[in-house]
Amino acid sequence: MTDNLPEIEEKEHRMRSASYHNPDRLLRHVSSMHRALTDTQVCVAVRVRPLNTREIEAQSNKCTELLGPGTLKITTAGQDPKTFHLDAVVHEDAPQEAIFHLTAKHIITKIFEGYNGTIFAYGQTGSGKTYSMIGGDETSEEGVIPRTCRRIFDTIAKDTEKTYLVKAQMVEIYKEKLKDLLAPEGFDLRAEEGSKWNGKLLIRHDKSKGGKGIYITGIREKIVTNTKDVLDLVQSATDKRVVGETNMNSESSRSHLVLSLTISCQHVTDVEGYTRTVSKLHMVDLAGSERAKATGATGARLKEGAAINKSLAALGKY
């Protein structure tokens, strides 16, 4: 005698759901996924968000189902279900801590080994990118950026044999133009750089050995010595960031926000002598992709949306 197939599937679904409602079990699950991703150069993780107030009031149905650690099924009305296989899929009940462990922890390890790294949140407008990256006011709601900064400075504090210098820069990309979010309002850097500089922030690529790599001319950097220093800069930058209301999000980010940390490490030993490594970590809160029909955008909002989609399309070229 064999079990009924639908009953088996229902049992498996309940077991998966139970694991996400048990914090300890969920973190063990995330830890196992983290170990599997440690040696992966590019990791794609999907975070499923719960229904928002607007969707609940409209009595919308959930369209996602987790079939396994890296498998997601999406069901759209009138269409056949589609299954996607990714590096990791995180349930809507997963806490912010789990997102950090999965997406940032292994990158921080590599940063201290001399590698560069990037963490960015991509998704439709209103999908929770800013919440995932920056988070809320409570400690338990802290996003990837504050948790990553705290881990970096905790690691530095414990490593007493090396000397570290950490610098931060923050840039906003709004309608395809760069803005230095660490520069005071109305500040003109031309006075410092000399009359030959036209005041524009430009992206450059230094391909020379030991060179800067990709960098921005004219942007300000600030030395940061602890997590609070960075979070104060993030808060100040967030206050300057362009946001606006659409039908899909009352506080829609209309620009991309890039926080870059440059971590320099000096080490002197009797055997190897003097060594110096420089690593860069970029953490990006992208503006959300959007359809004008869904957002109801017109005028300036419509132009912003077109610029957002144009820059996001560049991700598919690399």
Regions found by a protein language model. Give the residues of each.
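Microtubule-binding structural modules
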Residues: 2-318
